[in-house]
């Protein structure tokens, strides 16, 4: 998951998505180990079902850093829903609607799996953008997903990392981070915690 400030802003909003699972919302109830394992990424060579655990409706809590890579510590928060649907054989699309102190977010995530490279491409967009972002590309290892892209932000070449972690049967965490030093250090700027809505 940048060539203009508007595109950067859209990517920030897209992660976790959310981009997109945050720091503080634990699952309200613990599920059985079998249930947890059935929703966790498969971790097999054919990873087209790595995101199957994410299919469903989620409560989403999102935190966005207003001014990344400036030393700022001003965050805004949003609450809403993320509805993730399966498409084709393993791909999926998520629609996020959330409201917060900085207004309303209407976001979309598209995740496509390449069976030749065994990699995922994660795309983001929002209701005002009218286009998909360049993809963040990567995969899952040991229950964590990391996806990378090189972009331009405020005239500087940066690395973008979109991560998926803390995956349980009914909760997960997404994080977008930027690096301005080639990946030596990372600053998180979009953090999302999601909790599965049970029928």
Label every PLM stretch briefly.
Residues 1, 20, 24-26:
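Glycine-centered signal
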Residues 2-13:
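Bacterial N-terminal signal peptides that target proteins for export
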Residues 11-22:
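Bacterial N-terminal signal peptides
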Residues 27-199:
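Hydrophobic small-molecule pocket/channel-lining residues, especially in calycin-type beta-barrels
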């Amino acid at each position: 998951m940048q060539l203009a400030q508007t595109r950067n802003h859209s990517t920030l909003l897209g992660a976790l998505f959310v981009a997109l699972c945050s720091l503080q919302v634990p699952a309200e109830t613990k599920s059985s180990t079998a249930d947890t394992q059935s929703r966790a990424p498969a971790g097999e060579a054919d990873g087209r079902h790595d995101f199957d655990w994410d299919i469903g409706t989620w409560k989403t809590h999102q935190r966005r850093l207003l001014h990344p890579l400036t030393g700022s510590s001003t965050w805004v928060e949003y609450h809403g829903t993320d509805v993730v649907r399966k498409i084709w054989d393993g791909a999926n699309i998520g629609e996020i609607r959330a409201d917060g102190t900085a207004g309303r977010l209407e976001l979309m995530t598209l995740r496509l799996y390449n069976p030749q490279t065994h990699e995922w491409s994660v795309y983001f967009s929002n209701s005002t953008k009218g286009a998909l972002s360049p993809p963040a590309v990567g995969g899952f290892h040991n229950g964590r997903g990391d996806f990378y892209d090189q972009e331009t932000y405020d005239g500087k070449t940066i690395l973008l990392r979109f991560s998926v972690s803390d995956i349980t049967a009914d909760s997960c965490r997404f994080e977008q981070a930027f690096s301005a030093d080639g990946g030596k250090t990372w600053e998180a700027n979009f953090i999302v915690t999601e909790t599965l809505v049970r029928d």
